């Protein structure tokens, strides 16, 4: 009898392994390495992981002629184009977060050793989700990401941070339990955990198993709904984003959200693309998310809570892309996630740079910002305009693509609602933007002092990204719109 060994090629795992090594180095060396050295090392690990993505894509000069394997462990891990694209967005968000942390973590009273280690573990989980080829790997990545994120939310020694972390843990745990329960139903209906196997079974499913499949699908949708803050599973978002350190809020609203949508795209855009029932339910949830997210944001005075409800509204736009064709929807989602990461990092990096404590800036605190920090005021105004979807910024084209996907898929009411919600968003985005350029002889708040070179680099990169991708959207969309990127989404 011949012993058949599983495929254990490490090449598809290289981006994940490099970040994991960074996490281990932070864990072991965080208590004796200087704080800037530790963060600089993690930045190098993230850049190395990004370089490995380029190598796996085949775009690196040293990779010419090399036969690079695309999967490992019998397809459980897949380095397909969609994984590389979404993984690159995850790494970009992590890189910008680390840059901002160099200048602002000490003010937030956050331990560099703990912050860097937990962040790198969370990024490891995020990459596992993007590279997953079956439900087990996706679930492992999701739990690694979630557990590290729960602790990150509590890192600051304050009651608000502890409360935020507890709420995030409780509601996130419920979401994970629902998701696991749903995955069990999917396995019961299809008899496989592999995305490609599930897609094949769904297309030729025994009628007796349709009820089990629909139940599992709706449970999985609900579990992911908690992770991405889809209404009515969004209740944790404003409290966690406003109570956690701004650095952590930045990470949760970008990297974690990108990874969660990568998982949703794998499951609903690949394995369950032909599954029954979930499109109608997701349509209703998207409508609720657009309405409630924008309506709640109109009444916020705390700037981070405003951005939290804004994130809920953007979740609605991001989820709209899942309603359409996998190739078109995947391209729109890939573009939107990159743009959303840049916009959100830019806005929250400015907040992190300005605030002296973690009590949070109010909208009135923005009055007269231009006369004290003109560069930050202009950068924040550009980010808010892009979040609102105003041309010529990249946020306009991102929202346009999401609406186009829904419209061409036949969801006319959702498309109209998305347009109306974009108009409503102008009110709460432009209010702080206008206050920043109004003179104020008696400022309500004293901003933080000192040089913030790393944060300035992160803000500048974000600003350049949203302007260039707005003026020349095909620089990114023309690439991600290739059907070949999304053809292998289910692992087929």
Curated annotation (Swiss-Prot):
Places the protein is found: Cell membrane
BP term (GO), one: ATP synthesis coupled electron transport
Chemical reaction(s) catalysed: a quinone + NADH + 5 H(+)(in) = a quinol + NAD(+) + 4 H(+)(out)
Gene Ontology molecular function: NADH dehydrogenase (ubiquinone) activity; NADH:ubiquinone reductase (non-electrogenic) activity; quinone binding
Broad class of enzyme this protein falls into: translocase
Membrane topology term: Multi-pass membrane protein
Keywords associated with the record: Cell membrane, Membrane, NAD, Quinone, Translocase, Transmembrane, Transmembrane helix, Transport
Principal location listed in the UniProt entry: membrane
Presence of the UniProt keyword Cell membrane in the record: yes
One GO cellular component, as annotated: plasma membrane
Transmembrane segments: 13-33, 43-63, 82-102, 110-132, 136-155, 169-189, 210-230, 245-265, 272-292, 306-326, 331-351, 377-397, 410-430, 457-477
Family indicated by similarity: Belongs to the complex I subunit 2 family.
Subunit structure: NDH-1 is composed of 15 different subunits. Subunits NuoA, H, J, K, L, M, N constitute the membrane sector of the complex.
Purpose of the protein: NDH-1 shuttles electrons from NADH, via FMN and iron-sulfur (Fe-S) centers, to quinones in the respiratory chain. The immediate electron acceptor for the enzyme in this species is believed to be a menaquinone. Couples the redox reaction to proton translocation (for every two electrons transferred, four hydrogen ions are translocated across the cytoplasmic membrane), and thus conserves the redox energy in a proton gradient.
Name under which the protein is recorded: NADH-quinone oxidoreductase subunit N
Organism of derivation: Deinococcus radiodurans (strain ATCC 13939 / DSM 20539 / JCM 16871 / CCUG 27074 / LMG 4051 / NBRC 15346 / NCIMB 9279 / VKM B-1422 / R1)
Gene responsible for this protein: nuoN
């Amino acid at each position: 009898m011949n012993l058949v060994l599983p495929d254990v090629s490490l090449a598809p795992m290289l981006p994940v392994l490099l970040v994991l090594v960074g996490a281990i180095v932070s864990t072991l060396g965080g208590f004796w390495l200087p704080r800037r050295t530790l963060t600089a090392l993690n930045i190098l690990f993230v850049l190395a992981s990004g370089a490995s993505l380029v190598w796996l894509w085949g775009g690196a000069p040293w990779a010419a002629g090399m036969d690079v394997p695309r999967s490992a462990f019998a397809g459980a891990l897949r380095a397909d184009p969609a994984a590389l694209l979404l993984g690159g967005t995850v790494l970009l968000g992590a890189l910008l977060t680390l840059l901002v942390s160099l200048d602002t973590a000490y003010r937030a009273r956050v331990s560099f050793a703990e912050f860097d280690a937990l962040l790198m573990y969370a990024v490891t989980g995020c990459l596992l989700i993007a590279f997953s080829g079956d439900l087990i790997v996706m679930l492992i990545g999701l739990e690694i990401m979630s557990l590290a994120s729960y602790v990150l939310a509590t890192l600051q020694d304050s009651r608000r941070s502890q409360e935020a972390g507890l709420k995030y843990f409780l509601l996130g745990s419920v979401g994970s339990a629902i998701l696991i329960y749903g995955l069990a139903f999917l396995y019961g209906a299809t008899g496989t955990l592999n995305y490609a196997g599930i897609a094949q079974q769904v297309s030729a499913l025994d009628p007796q198993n349709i009820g089990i499949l629909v139940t599992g699908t709706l449970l999985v949708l609900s579990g992911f709904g908690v992770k991405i803050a889809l209404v009515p599973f969004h209740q944790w978002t404003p409290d966690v984003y406003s109570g956690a350190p701004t650095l952590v809020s930045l990470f949760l609203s970008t990297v974690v959200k990108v990874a969660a949508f990568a998982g949703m795209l794998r499951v609903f855009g690949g394995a369950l693309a032909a599954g029954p029932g979930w499109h109608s339910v997701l349509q209703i949830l998207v409508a609720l998310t657009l309405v409630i997210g924008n309506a709640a944001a109109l009444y916020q005075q705390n700037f981070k809570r405003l951005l939290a409800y804004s994130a809920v509204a953007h979740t609605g736009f991001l989820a709209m892309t899942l309603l359409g064709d996998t190739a078109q929807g995947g391209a729109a989602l890939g573009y939107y996630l990159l743009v959303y990461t840049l916009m959100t990092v830019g806005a929250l990096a400015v907040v992190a740079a300005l605030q002296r404590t973690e009590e949070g800036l109010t909208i009135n605190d923005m009055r007269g910002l231009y006369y004290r920090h003109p560069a930050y005021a202009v950068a924040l105004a550009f980010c808010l305009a892009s979040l609102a979807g105003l041309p010529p910024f990249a946020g306009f084209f991102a929202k346009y693509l999401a609406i186009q996907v829904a419209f061409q898929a036949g969801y006319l009411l959702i498309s109209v609602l998305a347009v109306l919600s974009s108009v409503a968003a102008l009110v709460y985005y432009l209010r702080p933007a206008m206050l920043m350029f109004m003179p104020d002889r008696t400022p309500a708040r004293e901003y933080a002092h000192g040089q913030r070179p790393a944060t300035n680099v992160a803000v500048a990169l974000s600003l350049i990204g949203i302007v260039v991708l707005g003026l020349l959207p095909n620089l990114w969309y023309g690439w991600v719109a290739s059907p070949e990127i999304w053809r292998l989404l289910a692992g087929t």
